[in-house]
Amino acid sequence: MADFVGSWKYGHSENMEAYLKKIGVSSDMVDKILNAKPEFTFTLEGNKMTIKMVSSLKTKITTFTFGEEFEEETPDGKKVMTKVTKDSESKMTQVIKGPECITEVVREVVGDKMIATWTVGDVKAVTTLLKA
């Protein structure tokens, strides 16, 4: 998991608007999220990871233990249950159970890029972060 540790800046995304609409985000909030251009800092302490996201919308800090389900809040204020598992030192899978749907997010570090693939039903979006 050491591959994730450090600072990451937003690179680009593909099909994120369709994904956000599929999970029930309002049109107004979709526009705000798409223009937020977040930066992330990942830290690791034992089996706990902390992800700090700073964007024009807000700052969000999420700390979790791999393999344990926890409650978190989405950017549009919905409460969801989330579980993150380690797939390898450079890959993790997050399952988000929300009121309308279940989303799977697979994050993988490849060189100086972190590629996150967001899947809900038949809709898939990809976000690429660049090592800062």
Swiss-Prot record:
Pfam families, per database record: Lipocalin
Modified residues (N-acetylalanine): A2
Name of the protein: Fatty acid-binding protein Fh15
Gene3D superfamilies per record: 2.40.128.20
GO molecular function, one term: lipid binding
Family: Belongs to the calycin superfamily. Fatty-acid binding protein (FABP) family.
UniProt keywords, alphabetically: Acetylation, Lipid-binding, Transport
PANTHER family: FATTY ACID BINDING PROTEIN (PTHR11955)
